[in-house]
Curated annotation (Swiss-Prot):
Organism from which the protein derives: Burkholderia cenocepacia (strain HI2424)
InterPro entries: ATPase_NBD, Type_III_PanK
Gene behind this protein: coaX
This enzyme's EC code(s): 2.7.1.33
Descriptive protein name: Type III pantothenate kinase
The protein's assembly and partners: Homodimer.
Function: Catalyzes the phosphorylation of pantothenate (Pan), the first step in CoA biosynthesis.
Organism lineage string: Bacteria, Pseudomonadati, Pseudomonadota, Betaproteobacteria, Burkholderiales
Amino acid sequence: MSEPHLLIDAGNSRIKWALADARRSLVDTGAFGHTRDGGADPDWSHLPRPRGAWISNVAGADVAARLDALLDARWPGLPRTTIRARPVQCGVTNGYTTPEQLGSDRWAGLIGAHAAFPGEHLLIATFGTATTLEALRADGRFTGGLIAPGWALMMRALGTHTAQLPTLTTDIASGLLAGAQAEPFQIDTPRSLSAGCLYAQAGLIERAWRDLVAAWQAPVRLVLAGGAADDVARALTVAHTRHDALILSGLALIAADAAPATAQD
């Protein structure tokens, strides 16, 4: 029986992981913080030894060192690969002028999306610390993207750089807007700030989607991912699809594609 692959997505806010079997199915998943202060270490005690770890890390050197320590403690000597964007991989062609400048998380997400929705033009919107958009043609060509502050970052910037506006988290804002989003305008400052930043996210997505449909003269599936996707989705007026594992699914494909070359590991 083929050994599984351990997949790790180290984002700007937290670290997600999954174990992928020979069919590239995610059979076990979890999440943990950048530091032990952010939550307990992952419980990998029940997992079999994987063939190797495949890592997307956009969180920096300290997180890379934490991951190395965790992997060495559980599986000493485990091979590991930190992925980078390439010009071409797993059926996706990178349209960046300098392909390696594309974030590894966005690259893995593109690969995951191309496999999840074959033969379709896609606009992929991912809501994390930053909101990112990727335009992906049905033939696998990534033609470019957009990066904007995420919902939480927008609200935090207003709270930090003004004298009278509150600093709100997404949890607080989501609670404030529960049941209130049917109203286009809000009647107090916290809700006005929450809804204004949320509508800024939705407006960006809808404008980008409409521009892409017009440019390509073809249907484009809007795919949402990331922690704030549910909140933004409620503010959208266009059809969309939710997918919560694009990056991990893309990592599974990258690992499987490289497996023959690392069969001796």
